[in-house]
Amino acid sequence: MSGRGFTVKKNWDNPREHAMPEGVRVPAEMRIGPVSITPATVLAPMAGVTDTVFRRFIRHASLFSSDQLSVVSDQEKASEIDAEVTNSQSGCGLLMTEFTSADGLSRMRESKRKRYLTFYDDEHPIAAQIFGSNPETLAEAARIVQDTGFDLIDLNLGCPAKRVVGCNGGSGLLRDLPKIGEIFRAVRKAVTIPFTVKFRLGWNDAQIICVELARMAEAEGLNAVALHARTREQGYTGQARWEWIAAVKQAVGIPVVGNGDIRTPEDAAAMIAQTGCDAVMIGRAAPSNPWIFRQIAQYTATGSYERPTAEDRHRLIRTYFQMLLDEAEASQSLPKDARMGETAGKMKQFASWFTHGVPGGAKLRASIYQARTGAEVLAQVDGFFSALDSGDSSAETEEEAIYRESALVCD
């Protein structure tokens, strides 16, 4: 699979049979400046994925389980969901936006900015991630983010995409530490909210600069760093090298967030044990398993965790799709026909992820891909799970699973 796809064996429905590292827990809290991240788990920024609908979906994912039905019923009667209760149920402590161009933010009209910077009260704490290469432009974008009400601002130094690197953004800047220093100083001077950075090991194995970069971030007044433990040259291939997360943690006094190859609660515990990092960041596993944050919280507390039933998956798929439709109806950022078309497209995109482990999932995906509207997609989902309840289904083949897994979007 080329481009943004990748293939990975997923283990969350059949977790590895080993005990959690003795005495190790994903921390109950991490503080980034004055902001409390409770628990210390972070949803990674992912292009085309972590919009406001997906972020709220992740924050409330535990409410889509059959054992939470009474909670859902009670919450639906309220005008809004209590953020503290929801955090403890979902296990996701910090949400992050899709990465957004600083050049775009500084130039676009206020009405268009809302398309990229929209968030709701139940998303706090939330960070906005920006990318670019001009210190003054990034500083102006950071001011816009702060004025919009975000809790944190994050700088992307990790994206390996050619179109971003070609503009000297994302991981392209890893070859220019002096420029990064200028950016750190400009953004830090521009805002008072916590300022963080996400970066990779370096451009390639011959240019690993993550420890030096982390020390620079601390010296310039940044409040935390997040490391995806691969080089830009690696992209999303090979194993994440967690030993470098440990090296960064030993080198700085500010919080360190570890990222890379966390697919199960066991992985999260192992990363904490091996690196001593202050929090874990989860990207590509979240679209396929929105329960992963809750499972990490359960595993930390008890050493075991629940796996979703088919009924849970039905509720999850239907709820997310309905959230997409509701947001499209409410949004004014595009003409209605365009909004609805975009929504139907996103439903099809996510269908291959959410149906992991569902008997006959390929049949549901095929029917969703043929649907022309969001309403038709919802009808196909309901019809499929109704038939599944009656026993009319066929198991997903290994070939189908490989195709679905290769379609995931990289973070």
Predicted regions and their residues:
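N-terminal small/glycine-rich loop or linker at the start of catalytic domains
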Residues: I37-A40, D103-A127, C159, R163-C167, ...
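Short, solvent-exposed amphipathic alpha-helical segments in soluble enzyme
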Residues: R59-L63, I144-D147, I272-Q274, A297
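Active-site beta-loop-alpha junctions enriched in small/polar residues
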Residues: M46-G48, T100-A102, F131-S133, G158-P160, ...
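Glycine-rich, positively charged N-terminal anion/phosphate-binding segment
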Residues: P21-E22, V26-R31, M46-D67, D74-I144
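Alpha/beta enzyme core
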Residues: E80, E84, E136-G169, L177-I254
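Alpha/beta catalytic cores of nucleotide-metabolism and tRNA/nucleoside-modifying enzymes
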Residues: S2-G33, I37-V42, A47, L69-S70, ...
